[in-house]
Amino acid sequence: DECLKYGIEPLVTMFHFDLPQALAEKGGWGRRECTDAFVRFAKVLFENFGDRVKYWLTINEQNMLTLVGPLIGTFNTEGVANIQKELYRQNHHMMLAQARAMALCHEMVPGAKIGPAPNISAVYPASCKPEDITAAGLFSAIRNWFYLDMAVHGVYNHQVWHFLEEQDALPEIQPGDMEFLASGHPDFIASNYYSTATAAMDDSTEEADPA
């Protein structure tokens, strides 16, 4: 109300790295129940603020939660056998929560706009060598396009899906998941942009080594 009083248009981020402690203690985004809890939370937000807030961000920098969660303190690796698999399981649940929240926003607050807020970084090949160009394309898919393809089109990026297969990190896809993912359509993409990146092929392994 104070923002509107002074002519400031509020832009609300629904989730910014921190879960309620009760949910975190139950496993957080690693459990599907967290997806349902987020949708209930979204409903409360839209019911109470939808008449005044017209712009919503779903999950802040979801790709950072997945790519560097252990480094930024949003994921505890203790006792986790396959860290990659657990991170991408959490990511799948967040994607479901985001899609359902976007669909709910359009249903409950038709005039509102909602979208994701990934951390996007332009990725350049370290040289003009074909293998470095390939490495840059793969890293960009893992770093950027995976999250954009899912948010906008509701599908898994094929390059990243293949990467997850190789890493034994594929998430569990339950019946109805892909329909949920396809039902959420963003009105915009909010990009948090801090830096560019380069990528080169690791000659020792002949695999893409993001730098």
State the predicted function of each range:
Residues 4-211:
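Active-site region of glycoside hydrolase catalytic domains
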